[in-house]
Amino acid sequence: MNIIAGRLRETAECSQRINQAEGLVRDEEDVMSAITEQGMSRRNFLAGMAGVAGLAAAGLAGCSSAGGSKEASGSDASGLPEKWDGEYDVIVCGGGGSGLTAAYSALENGAEKVLVLEKAAACGGTTALAEGAVQASGTQWQKEIAGVTDDSAELHKKFWLTDAEGIVKEDLVECMAKNAPDNLKWMADSFNITFSNVFGCYPTPYMKDEYMRDRIHLITDASDETKTGGVVWTTNAQKAVEEKGGEIQTNTEVTDIYQDETGTVVGVAAGKKNYKANKGVVFAMASIDHNEEMAFRYDQQQYWDLKTQFVATAETNTGDGIRIGMAHGADSAFHGAVDLILQTWSYTNNQNPEIPYILIDQRGNRFVREDTTYAFHCRAMFNAAMAQGGIDGCTYMLMDSKMTTADAKCAWSDNAKDGAKAREAALADGSMVQADTLEGLAEKLGMSGTNLKATVDAWNAACAAGEDAAYGRKVQLTALDTAPYYAWKTQNTNIGSIGGLIIDTDARILDVDGNPIPHLYGGGVNTAGWLGPYYPGSGTCLQGALNWGRIAGASAAASK
């Protein structure tokens, strides 16, 4: 059924369904009889009811008449604008790494007129805030810089699939792994980029050693190797898009899409204007990072991060593309979050020195192998906190005096800039406590001194034996045996949520029945199906932004 046409009829139908969902129509047989007469199957009815309930809960406008921006230009009987304020081949919604890549790819693949609409005052998004790490196997840089000559897309795929814990679509992961080497070469050629370093991530407890390689490439400006990071990508990509004739509008929020009588996406509503897209619309508007309502309903870890931790992504990441897509029947999936311990950069890559510590819960017990890729042990921290304290639960990083002389990446080390001041500030605000004995530390934390001492004794014995029999840790088997002792109430830094609209290998956004929504494409973390319940290591999201943005732009340009 056409989603847009006949707004009055749509509003009436949505109102009726909501009334039914609220129990105002009590006789299920009467309800099913009525919808059967309208040609709807029970399966589609139930799917629609679930969608209506979810969208209503998330504050979506799927059951309203056309939004304010649509009404501004007037609509005809089909629900389409009476006139368009601009006409393009491809419209890209979102000007971060994936969106700019999609725009360039569309132009490169034959689209003559491409428009990028960015909600913020400038392009870049969270990509511009990122370290600039991109994963790939078998590249010239991996061979030349890291000396890795035995990697392959197959090993890379198996690495990603293992960390996904079975909660991804294998064809999407395979697509990313196979395309990754060429994507990096294309990125370098298209955006004046090189890669100045290649390093690796840490494993998870169930990862096979044979799947591990140094694959993380650091984005660097080919004209100035002092410039690194995601901002190099977005800056250079924006320039490349504009040089190819692409148009970019900032301070422009996309609020809806238009579909014709066949369900084909034909344009977007943005601000008070409506723009026609003859070939396709690409959603690259990130995930639900700062949308508390959607996180509450779909992503428990992201909600916890918003309420109690620190979310460091672009504030414009409010799931706009996901909300709009769901309102038009798109399928979705939500899993977890991308968290790290920024104060120590713990286990973010295998070139960083690590400080001696263990993680403990509110009872003083270890609960995870600490030397795992950062989002894995951060997920365990979330689970441990929730298990013992709910939304107000917490975990602790337990250290001894060696922390004060650790590497400068530790925020409280004397070797860090203002490290001693940072340590004193943490002690003053109570986020860190210090004591000369473990029993004294436990008392300050409100936990059993006997239990905490037993935990540390067991850890120290494992260090002496050279084997962590409890969890299998291999890095920094260093005893905590020198007073004073410190416990820091951990605070995760969130650099993104995991969840979005389901796509296929052509970056087409799928509806709840698994069918592509015609002329609607997705890139980056606006999409889902290629990331599992936690982040499998630096460079995965940027490869996802690159891969799906590149494919989405090309697919849209090729649309008929």
Indicate where each model-derived feature is located:
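N-terminal secretory signal peptides
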Residues: 1-41, 51-58
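Core beta-strand elements of the Rossmann-like FAD/NAD(P) dinucleotide-binding domain
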Residues: 86-88, 271-280
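N-terminal Rossmann-like FAD-binding beta1-loop-alpha1 element of flavoenzymes
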Residues: 90-115
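Glycine-rich FAD pyrophosphate-binding loop
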Residues: 109-127
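Conserved redox-cofactor binding core of oxidoreductases
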Residues: 176-272, 292-293, 463-482
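Glycine-rich loop(s) and the adjacent beta-strand/alpha-helix scaffold that form part
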Residues: 276-343, 551
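A glycine-rich dinucleotide-binding beta-alpha-beta segment and adjacent secondary-structure elements
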Residues: 451-530, 534
